[in-house]
């Protein structure tokens, strides 16, 4: 729905496939665990990642975001196990981040919890994800500085108006669930991300 409104003037009507309308399958989950609860109950979620302290900032990398992504992956795996659901991480779960350095960092954090999954899961940039989909997509924006906002965008114009190709691809890779991570204050300086955050919070 968001992609249709933001990029196609509402002209792209969602089909509403059964797997997008049915209840999420996680009947059993730990309600005291915030990450597990988010995964078990939300189809679209924005997770605010606080800015790192100045001395902890690294170019094209975000340690805290990588750790939260690893916790999301852990929650997905645990929920499937708790609910007796089969799951193939390499085919059903995908992670999109904008930088190679962040790809390595995310993989390293996942490896601390699930070494086999860290080897198999596809963690890549939005450009390389074009044309493929997963049941669950985790999209980490990674950036910590205002000047990096432009890196996330690829604005073009078509008949329906201005389209951010990168954001459009990132948020339309998910069949069932989409988790977006980033620094809310920073991302809200971009009009489309501002609208996306509002959309996630309402749904």
Which residue ranges define each predicted feature?
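A short acidic (Asp/Glu
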Residues: 101-108, 134-135, 190-192
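Conserved helicase motor "Helicase C" RecA-like lobe of SF1/SF2 P-loop NTPases
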Residues: 75-125
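Short, glycine/acidic-rich beta->alpha junctions
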Residues: 118, 159-163
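Helicase-core coupling region on the C-terminal RecA-like lobe
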Residues: 1-75, 132-134, 169-175, 179-203
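Short, contiguous acidic/charged loop-to-helix segments that flank catalytic cores in large enzymes
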Residues: 56-64, 85, 126-129, 153-160
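Conserved nucleotide-binding/hydrolysis micro-motifs of P-loop NTPases
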Residues: 100-103, 129-130, 143-146, 184-188
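A short beta-strand element within the Helicase C-terminal
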Residues: 124, 130-144, 148-154, 169, ...
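Conserved P-loop NTPase motor core of helicases/translocases
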Residues: 19-25, 111, 125-127
């Amino acid at each position: 729905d968001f992609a249709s409104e933001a990029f196609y003037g509402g002209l792209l009507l969602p089909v509403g496939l059964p797997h997008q309308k049915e209840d999420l399958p996680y009947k059993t989950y730990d309600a005291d665990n915030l990450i597990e609860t988010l995964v078990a109950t939300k189809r679209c979620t924005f997770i605010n990642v606080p800015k790192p302290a100045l001395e902890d900032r690294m170019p094209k990398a975000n340690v805290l975001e990588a750790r939260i992504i690893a916790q999301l992956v852990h929650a997905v795996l645990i929920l499937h196990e708790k609910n007796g659901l089969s799951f193939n991480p390499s085919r059903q779960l995908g992670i999109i981040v904008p930088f190679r350095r962040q790809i390595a960092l995310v993989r390293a954090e996942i490896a601390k919890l699930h070494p086999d999954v860290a080897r198999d899961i596809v963690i890549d940039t939005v450009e390389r994800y074009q044309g493929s989909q997963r049941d669950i997509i985790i999209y980490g924006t990674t950036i910590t500085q205002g000047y990096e906002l432009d890196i996330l965008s690829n604005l073009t114009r078509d008949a329906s108006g201005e389209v951010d190709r990168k954001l459009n691809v990132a948020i339309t890779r998910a069949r069932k669930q989409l988790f977006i991570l980033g620094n809310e204050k920073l991302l809200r300086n971009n009009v489309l991300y501002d609208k996306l955050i509002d959309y996630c919070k309402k749904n």
